[in-house]
From Swiss-Prot:
Cofactor detail note: Binds 1 NAD(+) per subunit.
Residues reported in the UniProt entry to bind NAD(+): 185-187, 219, 248-253, 271, 327-329, 373
SMART domains: AdoHcyase, AdoHcyase_NAD
UniProt name for this protein: Adenosylhomocysteinase
Amino acid sequence: MKKNAKMKAPTATKTAAKTPVVDYRVSKEAMENPEVFAKLAKWGREEIKIAETEMPGLMALRKEYKKQQPLKGARIAGCLHMTIQTAVLIETLVELGAEIRWSSCNIFSTQDHAAAAIAAAGIPVFAWKGLTEQEFNWCIEQTIVGWGKEGFNMILDDGGDLTNMMHEPRFAKEMKKIIGISEETTTGVHNLEVLVKQGKLKVPAININDSVTKSKFDNLYGCRESLADGIKRATDVMVAGKICVVAGYGDVGKGSAHSLRGLGARVLVTEIDPICALQAAMEGFEVTTMEDAAPLGDIFVTATGCCDIITDKHFMKMKNNAIVCNIGHFDIEIDMAWLNKNSKMREVKPQVDIHTLKNGKQVIILAKGRLVNLGCATGHPSFVMSNSFTNQVLAQMELFNNRDKYQDIAVYRLPKHLDEKVAALHLDKLGVKLTKLSSKQAKYLHMSPQGPFKPEHYRY
C-alpha cells in the first residue's frame, strides 16, 4: 500500500486457511472511534519523527539504498514488538521497496499509538496492547493470509512464533514461497537451531541475535537502561539498598545486573554456566543458587531464556512483597501457572499484580511474568534499537538478493563486514572519530584498511 493511502474499514474474506483477512486491526477504542484513531496516529507519528533522529543506522540505509530499491519484490511478514522504534524499521523496509504485514511478538508490548500511526500510513498491522492468547495467534495469522495469490516470500521474526506457525501443516503451501527468515532474539535463534537439529527447518535463516552489534548492544546496553525503567514505572520502588537477584548472566543478565548495581542495589546472580558464573564473580557479584537467594531478595529478575527459574518452592521462601519480573522473551521463566492456581490475585494497576500466597505473604508480579521492560515501560531506547534493526534490514537484503549464498538450509550469521558497517553507521551520532590504518599498518596486520578488523571468532 502507499504510505498515504486512506484507511478502509476492516473487511473479512475467506482464505485457504479459513482465517478472516482484514486490512488492519489496532486497539478497540481506535477501531470503534475515528477520533481516537486519528489522535493516536498523530501522537505516534510525532514520536516516530523523534525516534528517527535517534536511529542513524536505519536512516542511513534509507539514504544509501532508496534509489536502488533492494527490497522491491520482497513481501515481508513481520512478527516483532510493535513499538515506535519498530515503526521506524517498518517504514525503512517500505522505503527500500518491501511490502509489509505486521504483528507483535508479545501480548503486552505493543504501543497503541505506534500501531495506529503505521495503520494510518496504509501499512497492514495487527497489534494492540493486552492481547489474549487467541487474539495474539489471530494477529500472526493475519500476516500470513491476506497477501493475495502472490503470497509473501520473507519472514522477519522475534522469538519464533511466526516461524513455528509457518511450519505447521496448514501453512505448508505458503511456506513453499518463503525465501528466508531473519530472527531477532536469543529465544528465536534457539528455536531455529532446534528445528535444524530435528531436520524440520524449511528455509535458510539469518541469526540477527549473534551479530555483535545486536547482542553486545541491544541485549547488554539496552537492558541496562530499560529494565530499571520498567521496574520503577511499575512500582516506584527505591532500588538503592535493596537485594536484587538476577537469574542468568548472559548479555541480558549482565546488562540487568549492572543496571541494578548502578542504582545502588546489592546484586546476587544465579547461573548454570561456569564461564558466566566466573565472569559474574570477577565483576564483583555474589553468585549463588535461587534456593539460597529466594529468602534474601527484594527484587527478582529472570534473564535466562529457560523455564522454571522461579517456581513454587522459591515463591514460598520469599519475603513479603518481593517484586518478581522477567526480561527473557517468554513467560515460562516464572512459574505463573502454579502461582495463578495457588494464590489470590488482585490488580493494582495494569501490569502490576499482587498475589497472596497460602502462607499469607504477598508477591508483586510485573507484566504477568512477561517482558517487564516492554510491558511496564517502552522497551529499549531508540539508539540501541537502531543497531538491532539495521542488522534486520541488512539480513533481509542479504537473503532476498544473494540467494545463491544461502542455498543450504541452515542458520547463518551476517558477514563480519556488515556487522562492522552497522557500528560505523552509528559513530557520527556520538561524535566518534575513528582512527584509520595506514597502508603500512594494514600490511603489518595482514588486513585491508577498510576491514574486517577482527576474525569471526573474536568475542569483543
